[in-house]
Amino acid sequence: MVDEQVAVEHGTVSHTISREEDGVVHERRVLASGERVEVFYKAPAPRPREGRASTFHDFTVPAAAAVPGPEPEPEPHPPMPIHANGGGETKTNTQDQNQNQTTRTRTNAKAEERTAEMDDTMASSGGQRGAPISADLLSLSSLTGRMAAMAPSWMKSEVCGERMRFKEDVYDGEAETLAEPPRCFMLSFVFIYYCCYLAFLALLAFGFNPLFLPSFMPVGAKVLRGKGRDFGVPLSYGCPTNPFCKVYTLIPAVVINNVTYYPNNTDSHGGHGGFEAAALHVAALFESGCPNLQAVTNRNRTFNVTRASGRVERRLVQDMQRVLASAVVVMHHHCHYETYYVFDGVGPEFGTIPTPCFKDVLAFRPSLVTNCTAPLKTSVKGPNWSGAAGGMKRKQCRVDRLTDRSFPAYLEEVMYVMVQ
């Protein structure tokens, strides 16, 4: 079967003959120059699309793409042969050619009139010359249709105004819009990530750094109570070499009758105990204004305690009074004096020990005589000497670093208080 088509394109007449038996297409074209050409080719057999993409049409033109203008008039049909006298004579070939030429002339004139009307409409509406015509829009719509046809089967697109949104493919034929994640969620995720990163770096720098691990385990010194409850004992006396460790204040030793009583509750003759009694004896002599109290500093300076006149000497006497009174308070309540210095300045969760003076500690022994030449009484008893936590643990006191008299000389302190 042979189909013959006649098309008019821009003044060019093309005769197309296609055969369904072998699919060969024979075209006779008349170029604008008047030259006649013949083209033979085999049209490819169309294949149906597969999947959900088959629902898209390649040449779908949206409603917004329609160009306003007059409706094109239908092309005239080719003239039918006129039979005269019941099928006798017909018109000659010359008459047929003249009629075809007249038809082509009329068609070309109508096409030129439609083009002129479209140009006038665009000019009157303020549009620009050379705007895309309907053929260009048809080509754009066909490109969009082809792109949509190549989309995966689980995704389909829908044009809504000037925006294209993608929808999920569901089995019931309906689609749900994919919601984009909010930007606040993304910003919060980045913020949390960097916070965790900085916390991890701080943990590595401080938490797992061996230089910041103290060599002692603090035991909280509870607040003093009226019933004389015992304090705890520190488990260690070492101090790591880092700037966060508080240097112990030097507690002066007491020399009475050529016997030195050290703050670790030992003496120069190898005995144990007696530092609390020696400190109380110095407090009684100081409050009585006895002139037989001499102080020796770590810079080999010697001066009279009760007659200190210089600014540095008065500061040394005040520091000596504070540390001796604090040591007496701690020892009187059966607690090592190191506890006071470890927790001095720490928060209230560990409790605080009030800074006493000589008048406060003299209340522990109201029977002390005020004679400047009175002998030392070492039999000092405090409340609750017996019990699980009662008494001093001499083995731990011997390892105290405060027994070292080589205190650094960057700050002058009193090392010995001598009773002459």
Curated annotation (Swiss-Prot):
Location in or out of the cell: Virion membrane
Sequence similarity: Belongs to the herpesviridae BDLF2 family.
Residue ranges of the TM segments: 185-205
Segments for region (Disordered): 1-21, 64-129
Protein name as annotated: Protein BDLF2
Membrane topology: Single-pass type II membrane protein
Superkingdom classification of source: Viruses
Quaternary structure annotation from Swiss-Prot or TrEMBL: Interacts with BMRF2.
Record: glycosylation sites: 258, 264, 300, 304, 371, 384
Source organism: Epstein-Barr virus (strain B95-8) (HHV-4)
Function: Rearranges cellular actin to increase intercellular contacts and thereby promote virus cell-to-cell spreading. Induce the outgrowth of long, branched plasma membrane fronds to create intercellular network for virion traffic. The fronds are actin based and RhoA-dependent.
